[in-house]
Amino acid sequence: MTDLDICAPSAELQGCLLEHQEELLIHIIQFHDLMNRYESAIKEVYTKLEILKNDFHLHNNRDCITMIQTRIKTPVSILNKLKRKNIPISMESIRTELNDVAGIRVICSFIDDIYMLAEKLRNQDDINIVSIKDYIQNPKPNGYRSYHMIMEVPVFFRRQKST
């Protein structure tokens, strides 16, 4: 095998990339915009949780939340999940078919705190609860216990509002 043989596929790939560079750039920009929306939504919910935590501490002299962790799925993880579920790879599919691109894990001091916090979030006018899975009341067969809320929150950008 010569250096030329190794470079041939690379040159072919470069030609393909050059031919479709504008389209690729548009998709990259759209993906970054979508991830920015998820990051912004996480900031909105994180702020709500911090406010509730501080308010609870002020009025009850204890913390109901011991930890808040946030995460955004990586592009590779998003792609793998779309492929695994046989979902078309598109921005629209990410937005409409995946409900775990962004996530917040909240660790509470007591189980009652979880339900109190969930109720406080449900009562906020700008939060739309999409679904709830209560694995505390109904643990999984393997013993997993948790409370999952999937929600939509509005995020206000320079030119538009997004959920």
Label each residue range with its predicted role.
Residues 1-97:
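Charge-rich, low-complexity segments
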Residues 49, 104, 147:
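A broad, low-specificity signal marking well-ordered, structured residues that form hydrophobic/aromatic
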Residues 82, 105, 139-140:
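Solvent-exposed, flexible loop/coil residues
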Residues 98-100, 143:
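Short flexible coil/turn linkers enriched for glycine and charged/polar residues
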Residues 102-108:
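Short cationic amphipathic helices and targeting signals
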Residues 110-163:
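Long beta-strand-rich cores associated with HINT superfamily self-processing modules
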